């Protein structure tokens, strides 16, 4: 447990996470100062009066006078104000670092470009099925500091690359990088390896590293070692097995579950299940209750979620596909009897869209591209692409064309912030329009 008495603490970024940091320090007798580049950040009205605040910009004077800066994952460490503070020897951490210094129970830590919320939630469900008092949060749901509790027997944290950059005290009982594909390239000017390096921090001091046998970028820099357990489609300690038209989850050659008993579908979800099982095993959860959780878990909203099945047409909301890798996961092995009407678009965060091209061949694909990067996406296969300003226009365009056996899939490969508040709002809008138009 760290001692912050007498420290001059500055918190950058409000919102739920910033408020959890404020509460953390106030409970320890330290009154921090808070700043946010937004004029009226969320949570400003909930800030106790005693806490000094500065909004609309960063206050360099406060930063340079600090003993400790707690930075929101939303601000890049490369920001000139933070660079100057780091050069002056001022410690910069994030809320996850504060959490790791205090947590008394084992931590399962999960990162990756895609699938991390599903796997985090699944491991949490596995713990609950075993009767374990578990705290689930981090980059999903509740901020980590709100989970700190003497009664907690296990923590399961989803961590973003941004959170890992400011974390050095994590000692996970089990840690995984599910996959590494281009995302947030606007924050990583040196490209994919810089982004990967941030993710790799999760393995430091981990007891077990769960790696993806199909993705070399998830391996520790020095290669797999005795701490590593692997999962994969056809290879790995935890893998899929296809026999007589059925698919099984297997562990070291032993069949443990037929996927038809799972509520989740799609190959990417079966590998998510394998990763969750590997983490749960490493954390010492009983296998039987973990498998039971796999048969009852229905998945998360906005993640390949069937929002309407009507007149033989399936409308699927995969709004959480905010990067290319996530849309690839949705399209890989996807079977559609009729035509796939694919909605793509939004803010591509400087990503390369070309890996999607191989999934867009064939006569039964139609593209509807919208938002900031709609033009670029339509260029993937112009002869079957239509371009509109908004998602709603695209949906009104495609609705009269759908036939029984078709699928309408929103898997945009882009962030939503050019036209929506977040991916949830985009997904809810899709669901609303699907019910109106379908």
From Swiss-Prot:
The pathway is: Cell wall biogenesis; peptidoglycan biosynthesis
- Quick one: which gene encodes this? murD
State the top-level EC class. Answer: ligase
PANTHER family per the UniProt record, alphabetical: UDP-N-ACETYLMURAMOYLALANINE--D-GLUTAMATE LIGASE
Chief location: cytoplasm
One GO term in the molecular function aspect is: UDP-N-acetylmuramoylalanine-D-glutamate ligase activity
Q: Which GO terms describe its biological process?
A: cell division; cell wall organization; peptidoglycan biosynthetic process; regulation of cell shape
Q: Which protein, by its recorded name, is this? A: UDP-N-acetylmuramoylalanine--D-glutamate ligase
Q: Where in the cell is it found?
A: Cytoplasm
Catalytic activity of the protein: UDP-N-acetyl-alpha-D-muramoyl-L-alanine + D-glutamate + ATP = UDP-N-acetyl-alpha-D-muramoyl-L-alanyl-D-glutamate + ADP + phosphate + H(+)
A GO cellular component term found in this entry reads: cytoplasm
Tell me which EC number(s) this protein carries.
6.3.2.9
Q: What does this protein do?
A: Cell wall formation. Catalyzes the addition of glutamate to the nucleotide precursor UDP-N-acetylmuramoyl-L-alanine (UMA).
Show the InterPro entries listed in the entry: Mur-like_cat_sf, Mur_ligase_C, Mur_ligase_C_dom_sf, Mur_ligase_cen, MurD
User: Which Pfam families does its entry note?
Assistant: Mur_ligase_C, Mur_ligase_M, MurD-like_N
What family is it from? Belongs to the MurCDEF family.
Which positions in this protein are listed as binding ATP?
112-118
